[in-house]
Amino acid sequence: MERNLSTVKTLVQFITESQKHVFGASGDLSKILNDIAVAAKIINREVNKAGLLDILGMEGGMNVQNEEVKKLDVYANDQFISALRSGGQCCAIASEENTDIIPIENNGHSKSNYVVLIDPLDGSSNIDVNVAIGSIFSIYRRVSESGPGETVDCMQVGNKQVAAGYIIYGSSTMMVYTTGDGVNGFTLDPSIGEFCLSHPNLKIPEDGFIYSVNEGNYADFPREIQEYIYYCKTPDFETSRPYSSRYIGSMVADFHRNLIKGGIFMYPATAKYPLGKLRLMYECNPLAFIVEQAGGKAIDGEGRILDIEPTNIHQRTGIIIGSKNMVEKVEAFIQMNVGLNVYRLK
């Protein structure tokens, strides 16, 4: 059945209406969100026809994480950088694919007030097998005075974010974001080329029945995570256990499913990665901001993700994120094992 387009609220309309309720809003943040959406549409087009183009596979280089760079990673990175450069509201960009921040000299803009941190293509190891992948972004207000952005602008604690979101490229393409006033999801309607409000005021269920973790690393997990996984697998009628194990290997896809249905995603520190593996600034912080705005929790095993003081743009951390009661159950196991975990080196 065709929808009545007069009842559809596009992302542009939603952002414009929301801006009206913010005293003194300049519109700069709204423009950045729109620029990100434009880049996402272009990336979505290439993702959808990637199997028909010479854009799959390896690009040949290594990124700052010592991971092989895939062609679509490079393409996505270029699109976000181009969109944010041309917009004029962004003074610096930090990306998973770039060792250093990218300062932006905006001629004609006396003061560009924001910095954007991005993971251009999360889950890119799944590109070749047609599994859902995504992009993650985090936005901060600059702390330096003016001119091109500096490292200090990008190295802010997560609770200072002014906006964060992700785009998931799957059976449909969605953009989910927060500006600190709830979480809203928009689905790309290819017939009109616009993101349309499809999931207003998203809330993650307080309880869930899905746990997402790479159990291939079980032997390297801290004791409390091993015990929690055992708890998830143990039958119990009152708590509807055993829970379902669902792990895609794309953080955005796993997180998105758990946000909608309720669940927990875990990528803890391990013996091999004692400081964690996922990146704090452009993976964990933005998703932590979103989940808290949706009523969930995000911790690193010792405290709140959004309270971690960054020391490096590409800093890694463990993360446990999802439904409030499920994360708090992990915290209970952590408390029972205080002093016993040989892997916690922070």
UniProtKB/Swiss-Prot annotation:
It catalyses: beta-D-fructose 1,6-bisphosphate + H2O = beta-D-fructose 6-phosphate + phosphate. Pathway: Carbohydrate biosynthesis; gluconeogenesis. Mg(2+) 1 binds at E96, D119, L121. GO terms for cellular component: cytosol. Pfam families: FBPase (PF00316), FBPase_C (PF18913). Binds 2 magnesium ions per subunit. InterPro entries: FBPase_C_dom, FBPase_class-1, FBPase_N, FBPtase. Its EC number is 3.1.3.11. Substrate binds at D122, G123, S124, S125, N214, Y247, K277. One of its GO terms (biological process) is fructose metabolic process. The keyword NAD does not apply. Mg(2+) 2 binds at D119, D122, E283. Keywords: Carbohydrate metabolism, Cytoplasm, Hydrolase, Magnesium, Metal-binding. GO terms for molecular function: fructose 1,6-bisphosphate 1-phosphatase activity; magnesium ion binding. Its main location: cytoplasm. Its cofactor is Mg(2+). Belongs to the FBPase class 1 family. Homotetramer. This is Fructose-1,6-bisphosphatase class 1.
